[in-house]
Each structure stands twice: as C-alpha cells, then as structure tokens.
C-alpha cells in the first residue's frame, strides 16, 4: 500500500550458545549487527538500533500504544508527491477536528476495518485523534491507540474527509460507526501519505 514508518520495531531470537545457557551467555554486538543489517537492506529501509530485551518481549503484542500520522496537502507540490495526499477540493478542517474528537467516544471500530480479516476483536482504545496545520496548505492527522485494525487509519481519514467536504454530517458518522458496517463509512484514502511514527511498550 506504500505506507511509511519512521519507527518500526521487530524482534528476533538470538541463538543459544553450544552449552545451552541462553542468549545472555552469547555476546551480542548491537553496533556491529546494526551496521551489517544496513549493509544488506535496500536503500529505503534502515535499522536505527538493535537492543537486547527479555524473552517475553514481542514487537507486536507487547506494544501498549501506537501513533500514526496522515498527511494531506491542498495545493500542488511536487516535493510532497509520494509522501502526502493531494486533495483538490476545499476541506473544513475545523469540522474534521470536531468529528475526530467523536472517535474518542467509541471503542468498536468494525466500520473502519478491512472486511474478511481474521481478528478476534475490533475493539481499540483511541487516546488521540486530531488535525493540525503544519503550514499553509499542509495538514497532518495524528491518531493514537493501543492497537489498530487493518486499514483502520486510512478508513478513518477517508470518513473525516467526507465530513470535511460536507458530504457526511457528524451525526451520520456516528450512525456509520454504530452500524458496525464497513459500507457505511468513507472510502479508504491512499496509503502513501500514512506513517507509523511511534510505538510504546
């Protein structure tokens, strides 16, 4: 989908030594490993650091909070191509911010989940959802939660854009969320303007 990440965490199991004493007995040179991984990876992927953690650590399931940013620009700028979504119609960002706050009142985001996904629950605890203007014609949406569903942020932004275009009222957005029906929410926006920016453990 062309989604970016300025912060992404992965984990791996470091092999035990020959005596089976565990990875703590086998020295791990994090600096050297970072260097060697970056030599192998393509130019658009970089390892910032390698850190030892306990055996219970899981990059996905141990996370307690994640933050995404979505960028929109409303005037043509070739330098933003591939990194921000150009919207060529007027948007009411004040109304979109009002709608974003409504999201914090809900926890079941079935209406924003890609259909057919194999997840046990569509419950997510949102703690932040807001638009801010970075400079004239450039806006950023920030959303944080303990977990996200597949395609959830892009569907949320698409719905907020519908509100910003005055094609959906906040009341209609509420009904769409409460219907728990993907068809009732807005279309998913392009992935190239979406960034995973922070993960907390």
Q: Model regions: which residues?
A:
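Structured-RNA-binding interfaces characteristic of tRNA pseudouridine synthases
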Residues: 1-201
